[in-house]
Structures are given as structure tokens and as C-alpha cells.
Amino acid sequence: MGLRAGGTLGRAGAGRGAPEGPGPSGGAQGGSIHSGRIAAVHNVPLSVLIRPLPSVLDPAKVQSLVDTIREDPDSVPPIDVLWIKGAQGGDYFYSFGGCHRYAAYQQLQRETIPAKLVQSTLSDLRVYLGASTPDLQ
């Protein structure tokens, strides 16, 4: 699976992350409601992620994640990324959560971040962005 916006998309270890079975949020234990049943984790280039909402960060939390990623990267859950195909086949990768993890990987100057890709539609994106939803090609 390739990315149009540059870089490559590699698997970061299928099955890594949340154990099987439903958790309190309806997804797998430790997973999100979006990606709870998705086992595959990919290394997604930070450069292709679209983050349309500004983050409010706790610097201490970011530093804690930086330390954890350095010591035991597998203990940090992957972020969820909405993967949307545009009208003309373009690939778009939207990330709304995981702002502290995203900032930690940026601070570490990593080129990629572990992510679960959630195949989504323009209608799904409209839930997040409303009238600001772009016309994806």
C-alpha cells in the first residue's frame, strides 16, 4: 500500500497493540472505538498526516511519551488515522487524536509514527470538519 503524498507505508508489526475482545468503549481492550478491531499497525510518514485541528499540549505529557518511546516504543499505542480516498483516487490521511504521541514523535525527529489505518469516507470526515470539509481529489 503506497502513499501519494510521499514516503512509504510499512507495517510496524501486525497484531501489536490492544488484545482481542471487546472493551468498555465497544472496541478492543485498550483500542479506540474506531480501530478496536484493526490489528495491523503501519509506520505512517508524519509528512503525509493532515491534522486540521490545533492541539493543546501538556509539555510534561509529551516529555513522558518521548522518554517512553526511547525506552520501550512498543508500549505506546498507535494513533488512529482516517484513510480517505478522494474522488479521483487520491489518498488522504487525517489524524484527529493522539496529539501528545504525534508531538513526541516530532520531538524525537522520527519520520514515521505507528498508526492504525481506519478506512473512512468523505461523510465520515464531514462529521469532524462540518462545512470546512475539503473537496478531496
Curated annotation (Swiss-Prot):
<feature type="compositionally biased region" description="Gly residues">
    <location>
        <begin position="1"/>
        <end position="30"/>
    </location>
</feature>
<keyword id="KW-1015">Disulfide bond</keyword>
<dbReference type="InterPro" id="IPR003115">
    <property type="entry name" value="ParB/Sulfiredoxin_dom"/>
</dbReference>
<keyword id="KW-0049">Antioxidant</keyword>
<dbReference type="GO" id="GO:0006979">
    <property type="term" value="P:response to oxidative stress"/>
</dbReference>
<keyword id="KW-0547">Nucleotide-binding</keyword>
<keyword id="KW-0963">Cytoplasm</keyword>
<dbReference type="GO" id="GO:0016667">
    <property type="term" value="F:oxidoreductase activity, acting on a sulfur group of donors"/>
</dbReference>
<keyword id="KW-0560">Oxidoreductase</keyword>
<dbReference type="InterPro" id="IPR036086">
    <property type="entry name" value="ParB/Sulfiredoxin_sf"/>
</dbReference>
<dbReference type="GO" id="GO:0005829">
    <property type="term" value="C:cytosol"/>
</dbReference>
<dbReference type="GO" id="GO:0005524">
    <property type="term" value="F:ATP binding"/>
</dbReference>
<keyword id="KW-0597">Phosphoprotein</keyword>
<keyword id="KW-0067">ATP-binding</keyword>
<keyword id="KW-0460">Magnesium</keyword>
<dbReference type="GO" id="GO:0034599">
    <property type="term" value="P:cellular response to oxidative stress"/>
</dbReference>
<feature type="binding site">
    <location>
        <begin position="98"/>
        <end position="101"/>
    </location>
    <ligand>
        <name>ATP</name>
    </ligand>
</feature>
<comment type="similarity">
    <text>Belongs to the sulfiredoxin family.</text>
</comment>
<feature type="modified residue" description="Phosphoserine">
    <location>
        <position position="32"/>
    </location>
</feature>
<dbReference type="GO" id="GO:0032542">
    <property type="term" value="F:sulfiredoxin activity"/>
</dbReference>
<feature type="region of interest" description="Disordered">
    <location>
        <begin position="1"/>
        <end position="34"/>
    </location>
</feature>
<feature type="modified residue" description="Omega-N-methylarginine">
    <location>
        <position position="11"/>
    </location>
</feature>
<protein>
    <recommendedName>
        <fullName>Sulfiredoxin-1</fullName>
        <ecNumber>1.8.98.2</ecNumber>
    </recommendedName>
</protein>
<keyword id="KW-0488">Methylation</keyword>
<feature type="modified residue" description="Omega-N-methylarginine">
    <location>
        <position position="16"/>
    </location>
</feature>
<dbReference type="InterPro" id="IPR016692">
    <property type="entry name" value="Sulfiredoxin"/>
</dbReference>
<dbReference type="GO" id="GO:0005789">
    <property type="term" value="C:endoplasmic reticulum membrane"/>
</dbReference>
<dbReference type="GO" id="GO:0005737">
    <property type="term" value="C:cytoplasm"/>
</dbReference>
<comment type="function">
    <text>Contributes to oxidative stress resistance by reducing cysteine-sulfinic acid formed under exposure to oxidants in the peroxiredoxins PRDX1, PRDX2, PRDX3 and PRDX4. Does not act on PRDX5 or PRDX6. May catalyze the reduction in a multi-step process by acting both as a specific phosphotransferase and a thioltransferase.</text>
</comment>
